[in-house]
């Protein structure tokens, strides 16, 4: 679940450093992200080590809504649910019967999931962004303008204007690919999706 925490939960405080961005890529990514006020999808996630050996494979469903709302449910043996109501992030582990609650950090380099659900108007303050396009697919590579980040690069790929995958690579070459399917943009999402009612008797950890 390291990747889930990396994507959805606040990371360590980071120190900004200078970097260069491609203005056209920045504008294009902002435009694609801003087009979707809501997104729902299925996802499959695979984590590989630097040598290409599979470490973990999971699947589930997700939903996001601007500003700052997201729902991420991983199914199967590694079942977990992470929900943001725009103010706080709750991680629910049913096996442990434990809920961990964090304050939502609005900075994109602290909570990368906000690329899909947050304010991206200043995305180039957090990342150095480049892109490449082949046919109807455009891929963006984001490098954090920071030291000691949990990932070295974050890639977002869009096909026909809709996100189809994300990839994170960390400092030791471990790679996580997230493939989205059945993506629906700008469709109503029930408000209850972004509220998590902690089961009675569960352990609650405030961080």
From Swiss-Prot:
Where is the major localization of this protein?
periplasm
Q: Name one Pfam family in it.
A: LolA
Q: Where in the cell is it found?
A: Periplasm
Query: What is the documented function of this protein?
Result: Participates in the translocation of lipoproteins from the inner membrane to the outer membrane. Only forms a complex with a lipoprotein if the residue after the N-terminal Cys is not an aspartate (The Asp acts as a targeting signal to indicate that the lipoprotein should stay in the inner membrane).
Instruction: Kindly give the HAMAP family that the UniProt entry links to this protein.
Output: LolA
Name the family the entry cites. Belongs to the LolA family.
* Xref: NCBIfam families: lolA
Name recorded for this polypeptide: Outer-membrane lipoprotein carrier protein
């Amino acid at each position: 679940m390291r990747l889930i925490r990396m994507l959805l939960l606040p990371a360590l405080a980071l120190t900004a450093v200078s970097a260069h961005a491609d203005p056209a890529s920045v504008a294009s990514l902002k435009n694609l992200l801003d087009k979707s006020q809501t997104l729902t999808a299925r996802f499959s996630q695979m984590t590989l080590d630097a040598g290409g050996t599979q470490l973990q494979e999971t699947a589930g469903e997700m939903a996001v809504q601007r500003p700052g709302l997201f729902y991420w449910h991983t199914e199967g043996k590694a079942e977990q649910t992470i929900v943001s109501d725009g103010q706080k992030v709750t991680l629910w582990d049913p096996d442990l019967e434990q809920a961990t609650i964090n304050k939502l950090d609005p900075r994109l380099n602290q909570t990368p999931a906000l690329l899909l659900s947050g304010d991206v108007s200043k995305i180039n303050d957090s990342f150095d962004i480049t892109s490449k396009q082949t046919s109807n697919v455009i891929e963006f590579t984001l490098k954090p303008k920071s030291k000691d980040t949990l990932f070295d690069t974050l890639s977002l790929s869009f096909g026909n204007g809709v996100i189809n995958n994300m990839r994170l690579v960390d400092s030791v070459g471990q790679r996580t690919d997230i493939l989205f399917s059945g993506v629906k943009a700008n469709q109503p999402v029930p408000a209850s999706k972004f509220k998590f009612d902690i089961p009675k008797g569960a352990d609650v950890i405030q961080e």
